Every structure is written in C-alpha cells, then in structure tokens.
Amino acid sequence: MAHPSQLGFQDAASPVMEELLHFHDHALMIVLLISTLVLYIIVAMVSTKLTNKYILDSQEIEIVWTVLPAVILILIALPSLRILYLMDEINDPHLTIKAMGHQWYWSYEYTDYEDLGFDSYMVPTQDLTPGQFRLLETDHRMVVPVESPIRVLVSAEDVLHSWAVPSLGVKMDASPGRLNQTAFIASRPGVFYGQCSEICGANHSFMPIVVEAVPLEHFEKWSTMMLEDA
C-alpha cells in the first residue's frame, strides 16, 4: 500500500513484482556507479594542472570504452529479458477473470463459473467509512485466492483503458475489440489497490481497481455467496 511521502515502490505482493524490485536495485546500482565514475573524471580533469599534449590516440583506452559499455548493457539486458519472459508466461491458470474497461468503471467476469460477474464502481467520498481510502475504494472487489495462478483477460468497451495494480506487478492495456492477457500470483493475503493507467476521459481518475487476495476456503465461500445472490 502506498503511503504519504513514499519514495520507493509499494511492497511486493507477487513473485513478478519481487523480481522487478530486484532488477530496479540492480540497474540503479549500475547507474550510480557510472555516475560516480563520470563525476570523478570530470572533477579530476578540471582540478588537475597536469597536461599531456603528446597523447593523440590510445588503442588500449579505445578498447576499454568500447568493451566496458557493452558488458554493462549485457548485465542490464539479461535480467530484464528474464523478467519479460516471466511476465508473459501463463502456465495452467487456476482461475480466469475477464476485466472490461468502461467509461468510467470496471466490470469483472469469472469465466470458470457459469454466472459470476459484477460491475465495480468507485465509492463516492461522502459514502466512505473510517479506514477507507478516497478515490481508491470500490463497491465490489475482485476477489482471488492466494498462491494460485490467476489469468486476467483485459479489454474495453469504449475507449482505451489500462488495468494496473502496482503491488502485484501487473499493467495491461485495455483496447476496444482486442483481448489482452496478463497473469499474477498473489503471494500473501491482502487488499491491493490500482487505478486505470490510460487517460480515458473526464472521469479517468475515478476508475479504481481493488484486488482482494484471500485463502482458498474464503474464496470458495465468497464465490458461493455471489452465485446465490446472482
């Protein structure tokens, strides 16, 4: 969950998000090392009084500044490609949910059940109860079981939207007439908030996403209750 004055990412709630956090630290460390080296060279060149006007070329230096950047790029690219493959890999999902973007709300359909679906609207500020978050709460949450592979099919009915939940490391564009898919595994119980991440009109900022991860037995009770109320 995000908090005021936060500088870093939200706490990871899925294996993919944990990998993204590790990659961020890895890339940031490389950037800091390069920046420190460049700053040191600039300061040394400006502050020194020594000059050498006879060195016009140096094959050794040219080899170093060609090979070293290539090695650095490889060190960044390899873990990045690994995470890209992990994000695209969807093996034997236990549950498939279709998320449809509308102006300006989300609708969810649990395709493994015959008649389990609902619309999810933002709770107005005047209807919030103590402990709820402004512009982030919905009247119906997308409930999923913990530690189960979940596939989310994302589309839109009218304009471009984007289904994103930072804690779970998922963000997928919702395009009219196109069915995109993403997947995640909630590694711990909790309530995870997201928002539409594509400008979609006047009420774009009023399209929150709430994913609630619960133990399997609680999910079964919830799905049974929803089917009975349908």
From Swiss-Prot:
Molecular function in Gene Ontology: copper ion binding; cytochrome-c oxidase activity
Membrane-spanning segments: 15-45, 60-87
Reaction(s) this enzyme catalyzes, per UniProt: 4 Fe(II)-[cytochrome c] + O2 + 8 H(+)(in) = 4 Fe(III)-[cytochrome c] + 2 H2O + 4 H(+)(out)
EC id: 7.1.1.9
Alphabetical GO biological process terms: ATP synthesis coupled electron transport
Quaternary structure (record): Component of the cytochrome c oxidase (complex IV, CIV), a multisubunit enzyme composed of 14 subunits. The complex is composed of a catalytic core of 3 subunits MT-CO1, MT-CO2 and MT-CO3, encoded in the mitochondrial DNA, and 11 supernumerary subunits COX4I, COX5A, COX5B, COX6A, COX6B, COX6C, COX7A, COX7B, COX7C, COX8 and NDUFA4, which are encoded in the nuclear genome.
Similarity annotation: Belongs to the cytochrome c oxidase subunit 2 family.
Protein name: Cytochrome c oxidase subunit 2
Provenance organism: Salmo salar
